[in-house]
């Protein structure tokens, strides 16, 4: 074992004193290892804590109102854990000790909560104990307003559990008994268990295997959630006293299993059973959820008396026929939202859908969801009852396999704001339907030969780039359909349309300015993920009010060899402000310059600007004509360098420049003066290794600089000092080992954000960056938890405030350890070299010297051997094993009287806990002889072979032949080794006689062979046998 360096007690005392002084002065973050966030929240999430942190008395603990300990490993809560937090109102202990079924590795866990843990916090109002293995409700303070006990192991609720919680308003107990958190039965709510909670307004008991509504619920309830249990019968008595109820969710209790996304129990036949007066007395009900309930019809009497009903969810049922003829909606004049999604017929796609006339009585309806009903034609008659609804704003018809759609019908809806027809099969303007035959009164049509296009992954875009369509008055979503071409007649009567989404289609036509003629009010057009041919110079010029145009991911035409592309249409769009040409692999044969007086944001990421600028001056002024451009994204353009002349030809109005994920290994910082208005520069994800060439120029307006994800390991002193306007600096995920105040100078006081996380900081004793980060800790996000050490190895991955004081050694001790380690290294080099050059000579001399030592040659006495014989045989052969245990063992150990032998058997005498080789070696060397019982000698492997080799090794080392062979079958004599051994040492090879009269002689010969040295058995005509040197 190498030398060990010890710590001087005085050095440790000095370090402890320094740390205590720093904490007393308030320099360290107050709530280490957690982070103090605005509004009194202390965030301790995902820190792998095993106990509740006890914050220092110097910390402003009285100001803590919220404490979040989400996703740690706290298994025991003590009475004193929260006593010092006198103002605590919100406590989150979710995901600390999850039940085995919810644990990622299914490890069992049990959380222990001492009796006064929460009683010691009289101000506590909100407590979250979800996803913890607790079996009973702990003692709680009477100030509690919200309590979450979801996904726990609490299976019984009785009146004693919640006694005194008169202020409780919200109680959540979801998922305590379901397929992910299984139990033997169901959650038991004792009648009247919740009756004492006079202020309870919200109760959630979802996923608990309940078979009936709990009895004697408090009449103050306004929200009752009982979905995904097994309540298949509802009567007026179940909800008798809940007259204040405003929201009732009983969906998923009698499920439609052909559409289930998780384990599902089939609904019993002739169920569910809903009494006609079940909801009639709930006059204040505003929201009713009956989704996934296997409903085939709607009883008009169910909605009798529900004059205030505003939200009705009937999705995932079997109401495909009911939708066309029901009268149940006639009395729901205040209904605002109706969900009928996935009420499809199994394996049937309807040719047409005609809504029942009762839809026309929903005068207050604002949102109608009918996706997943599966009908193939959308015509004027389909939605006829909805035309007269004055407040209808949102209509969802996606995922219906619609292949023929008359889009002009939406022009008759004056108040419509959003129509979603995405994920259908619309391929163009509606054509006459070809009727083939009628089956069961249901019209069938030919389905298109093409399949529904697979939905590709959505591409995330910056929120501050393309406008959100929710801000416009009318939006039509036709994304993820089968459109190949666009004809203007598709959009007849849609002049009011302001936002049109056509992404993820297969549009491959050349747009020439005639496709969108009717859309005179269109302001946003999304054509991403298509195959548009931008050849004509008048593309989109029929849209005079177009403000945002997304042409990203239309790369196929740009990758075709020899095909030109005309981008001059940009100059002819007077209102265009946002344009995306991202991820089109644009590299050649395009317009030499983009021109626009109105464009303020351009996304040109995911192209090949490096090849364009490599063509001399051909594309050098590509962006110069965009006189009003403020935001430019040139990320992922394979740029290896950015010359000053390239920056000089960017618009001078530019304020935000993004150059993420290029290959930039060098940046000329002085060239930033060429962009006088630049405020944001994003260079993340490049290959910068140092900030050593100059510094940020003085007078720059730069406010945000992102250098994350590079390999920066060195920064020049004063590099950021002249950038007086810099407020946000991101240096995360680089190779920085320190953060020096000399980099910033006097401008450090202007920084609002300084991100240095994910750097391999070197946490040496007295590191200056710790003190500097403490001075600017208000600007460093995640300082206690995200800023971590990269070295030394003992601290790698730990917080910079978790420094081990034992690593801080004084100088003398450090030099001593260095000298000892240097000596050890030298010996480590010299010894193997000497062993390689003259190892045999050294070995010979060493053993020659040992031979002269007294008692070296003394042989080990027979009394040192623990066994007379180690019996080796093939356990896989049951006959051999039976002979050893019932014949050999009995004869040698039990029937020889005082001459009984001590045998070593593997299954009886080997020690558990040792390795196989350790037991084998001990058995061979602790036995006088090694007895091999063989039924055959041609295939010897495994334990037999290893034992034989050890016996041979003992022959070489101790010059003792310890092998004795017992042959159970005569044909085993065919082995050459057996024949040779029988000739040299006949008494050590014995054959088991199958005649009873010869067995007595066999046992006598075997006893002699095991008790005498084999040296006496060798045939002197051939050899003398092995001898032991004295």
Curated annotation (Swiss-Prot):
Keyword Lipoprotein in the entry? The reply is yes
Residues bearing carbohydrate: 63, 128, 199, 209, 241, 339, 512, 566, 668, 693, 730
Q: Which residues form the signal peptide?
A: 1-24
Quote the subcellular location field of this record: Endoplasmic reticulum membrane; Endosome; Lysosome; Cytoplasmic vesicle, Phagosome
The alphabetical list of record keywords is:
Cytoplasmic vesicle, Disulfide bond, Endoplasmic reticulum, Endosome, Glycoprotein, Immunity, Inflammatory response, Innate immunity, Leucine-rich repeat, Lipoprotein, Lysosome, Membrane, Palmitate, Receptor, Repeat, Signal, Transmembrane, Transmembrane helix
Name the residues that span the membrane: 817-837
Where are the LRR-type repeats located? 61-84, 86-109, 121-146, 149-165, 166-189, 197-220, 222-241, 242-267, 282-305, 307-331, 332-355, 362-385, 389-412, 414-439, 469-493, 495-518, 519-542, 544-571, 573-597, 599-621, 626-649, 651-674, 675-698, 700-722, 723-746, 748-771
Which ranges sit in the Extracellular compartment? 25-816
Q: Which GO terms describe its biological process?
A: canonical NF-kappaB signal transduction; cellular response to chloroquine; defense response to Gram-negative bacterium; defense response to virus; detection of molecule of bacterial origin; inflammatory response; innate immune response; maintenance of gastrointestinal epithelium
Question: TIR domain location, by residue?
Answer: 865-1010
Q: Where is the lipid attached (S-palmitoyl cysteine)?
A: 257, 264
Please name the GO terms that the record assigns under molecular function: interleukin-1 receptor binding; pattern recognition receptor activity; protein homodimerization activity; siRNA binding; unmethylated CpG binding
**Family, similarity comment:** Belongs to the Toll-like receptor family.
Task performed by this protein: Key component of innate and adaptive immunity. TLRs (Toll-like receptors) control host immune response against pathogens through recognition of molecular patterns specific to microorganisms. TLR9 is a nucleotide-sensing TLR which is activated by unmethylated cytidine-phosphate-guanosine (CpG) dinucleotides. Acts via MYD88 and TRAF6, leading to NF-kappa-B activation, cytokine secretion and the inflammatory response. Upon CpG stimulation, induces B-cell proliferation, activation, survival and antibody production.
Q: How does it assemble?
A: Monomer and homodimer. Exists as a monomer in the absence of unmethylated cytidine-phosphate-guanosine (CpG) ligand. Proteolytic processing of an insertion loop (Z-loop) is required for homodimerization upon binding to the unmethylated CpG ligand leading to its activation. Interacts with MYD88 via their respective TIR domains. Interacts with BTK. Interacts (via transmembrane domain) with UNC93B1. Interacts with CD300LH; the interaction may promote full activation of TLR9-triggered innate responses.
Descriptive protein name: Toll-like receptor 9
| Gene source species | Sus scrofa (Pig)
Originating gene: TLR9
């Amino acid at each position: 074992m190498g030398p060990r360096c010890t710590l001087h007690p005085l050095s440790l005392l000095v370090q402890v004193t320094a740390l205590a002084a720093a904490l007393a002065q308030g320099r360290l973050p107050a709530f280490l290892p957690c982070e103090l966030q605005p509004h009194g929240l202390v965030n301790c999430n995902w820190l792998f804590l095993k106990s509740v942190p006890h914050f220092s008395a110097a910390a402003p603990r009285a100001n803590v109102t919220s404490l979040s300990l989400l996703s740690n490993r706290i298994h025991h809560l003590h009475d004193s854990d929260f006593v010092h937090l006198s103002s605590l109102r919100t406590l989150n202990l979710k995901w600390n000790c999850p039940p085995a079924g919810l644990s990622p590795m299914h490890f069992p866990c049990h959380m222990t909560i001492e009796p006064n843990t929460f009683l010691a916090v009289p101000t506590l109002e909100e407590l979250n104990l979800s996803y913890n293995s607790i079996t009973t409700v702990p003692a709680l303070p009477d100030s509690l307003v919200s309590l979450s006990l979801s996904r726990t192991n609490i299976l019984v609720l009785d009146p004693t559990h919640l006694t005194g919680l008169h202020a409780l308003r919200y109680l959540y107990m979801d998922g305590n008994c379901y397929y992910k958190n299984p139990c033997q039965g169901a959650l038991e709510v004792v009648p009247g268990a919740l009756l004492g909670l006079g202020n309870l307004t919200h109760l959630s008991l979802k996923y608990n295997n309940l078979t009936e509504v709990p009895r004697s619920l408090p009449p103050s309830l306004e929200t009752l959630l009982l979905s995904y249990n097994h309540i298949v019968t509802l009567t007026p008595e179940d909800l008798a006293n809940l007259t204040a109820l405003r929201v009732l969710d009983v969906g998923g209790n009698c499920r439609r299993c052909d559409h289930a996304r998780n384990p599902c129990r089939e609904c019993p036949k002739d169920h569910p059973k809903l009494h006609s007066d079940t909801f009639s007395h709930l006059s204040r009900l505003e929201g009713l959820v009956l989704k996934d309930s296997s409903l085939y019809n709607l009883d008009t009497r169910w909605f009798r008396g529900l004059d205030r009903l505003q939200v009705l969810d009937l999705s995932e049922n079997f109401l495909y026929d009911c939708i066309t003829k029901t009268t149940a909606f006639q009395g729901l004049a205040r209904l605002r939202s109706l969900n009928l999604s996935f009420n499809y017929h199994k394996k049937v796609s309807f040719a047409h859908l005609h809504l029942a006339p009762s839809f026309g009585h929903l005068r207050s309806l604002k949102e109608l969801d009918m996706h997943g009903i599966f009908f193939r034609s959308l015509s004027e008659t389909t939605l006829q009852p909805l035309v007269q609804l004055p407040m209808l704003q949102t209509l969802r018809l996606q995922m219906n396999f619609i292949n023929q759609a008359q889009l002009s019908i939406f022009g008759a809806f004056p108040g419509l704001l959003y129509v979603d027809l995405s994920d259908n099969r619309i391929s163009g303007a509606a054509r006459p339907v070809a009727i083939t035959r009628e089956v069961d009164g249901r019209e069938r049509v030919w389905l298109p030969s093409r399949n529904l296009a697979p939905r590709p992954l959505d591409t995330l875009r910056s929120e501050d780039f393309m406008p959100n369509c929710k801000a416009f008055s009318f939006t039509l979503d036709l994304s993820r359909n089968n459109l190949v071409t666009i004809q203007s007649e598709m959009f007849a009567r849609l002049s009011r349309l302001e936002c049109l989404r056509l992404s993820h289609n297969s549009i491959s036509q050349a747009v020439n300015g005639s496709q969108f003629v009717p859309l005179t009010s269109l302001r946003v057009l999304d054509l991403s993920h298509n195959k548009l041919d931008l050849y004509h110079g008048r593309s989109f010029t029929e849209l005079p009010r177009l403000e945002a145009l997304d042409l990203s991911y239309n790369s196929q035409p740009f990758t075709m060899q020899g095909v030109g592309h005309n981008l001059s249409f940009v100059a002819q769009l007077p209102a265009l402000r946002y344009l995306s040409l991202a991820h089109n692999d644009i590299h050649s044969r395009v317009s030499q310059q983009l021109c626009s007086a109105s464009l303020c944001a351009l996304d040109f990421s995911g192209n090949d600007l490096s090849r364009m600028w490599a063509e001399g001056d051909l594309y050098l002024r590509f962006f110069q004509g965009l006189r009003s451009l403020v935001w430019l994204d040139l990320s992922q353009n394979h740029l290896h360098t950015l010359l000053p002349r390239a920056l000089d030809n960017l618009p001078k109005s530019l304020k935000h420049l993004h150059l993420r994920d290029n290959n930039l290994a060098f940046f000329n910082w002085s060239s930033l003066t060429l962009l006088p208005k630049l405020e944001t520069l994003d260079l993340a994800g490049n290959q910068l290794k140092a900030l050593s060439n100059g510094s940020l120029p003085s007078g720059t307006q730069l406010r945000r600089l992102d250098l994350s994800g590079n390999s920066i390991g060195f920064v020049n002193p004063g590099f950021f000092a002249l950038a007086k306007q810099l407020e946000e600096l991101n240096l995360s995920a680089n190779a920085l080992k320190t953060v020096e105040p000399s980099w910033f100078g006097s401008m450090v006081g202007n920084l609002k954000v300084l991100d240095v996380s994910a750097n391999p900081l070197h946490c040496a004793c007295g590191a200056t960056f710790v003190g500097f980060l403490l001075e600017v800790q208000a600007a460093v996000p995640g300082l206690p938890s995200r800023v971590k050490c990269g070295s030394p190895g003992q601290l790698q991955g730990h917080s910079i405030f978790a420094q081990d004081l034992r690593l801080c050694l004084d100088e003398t001790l450090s030099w001593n350890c260095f000298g000892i380690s240097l000596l050890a290294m030298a010996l480590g080099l010299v010894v193997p070299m000497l062993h390689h050059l003259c190892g045999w000579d050294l070995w010979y001399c060493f053993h020659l010297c040992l031979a002269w030592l007294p008692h070296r040659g003394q042989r080990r006495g027979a009394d040192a051997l623990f066994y007379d014989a180690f019996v080796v045989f093939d356990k896989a052969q049951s006959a051999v094993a039976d002979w050893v245990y019932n014949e050999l063992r009995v004869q040698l150990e039990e029937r020889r009287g005082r001459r009984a032998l001590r045998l070593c058997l593997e299954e009886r005498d080997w020690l558990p806990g040792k390795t196989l080789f350790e037991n084998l070696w001990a058995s061979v060397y602790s036995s006088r002889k090694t007895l091999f019982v063989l039924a055959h000698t041609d295939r010897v492997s495994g334990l037999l072979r290893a034992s034989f080799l050890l016996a041979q090794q003992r022959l070489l080392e101790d010059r003792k032949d310890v092998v004795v062979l017992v042959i159970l079958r005569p044909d085993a004599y065919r082995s050459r080794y057996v024949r040779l051994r029988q000739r040299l040492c006949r008494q050590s090879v014995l054959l088991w006689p199958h005649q009873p009269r010869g067995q007595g002689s066999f046992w006598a010969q075997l006893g002699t062979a095991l008790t005498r040295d084999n040296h006496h058995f060798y045939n002197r005509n051939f050899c003398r046998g092995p001898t032991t040197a004295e």
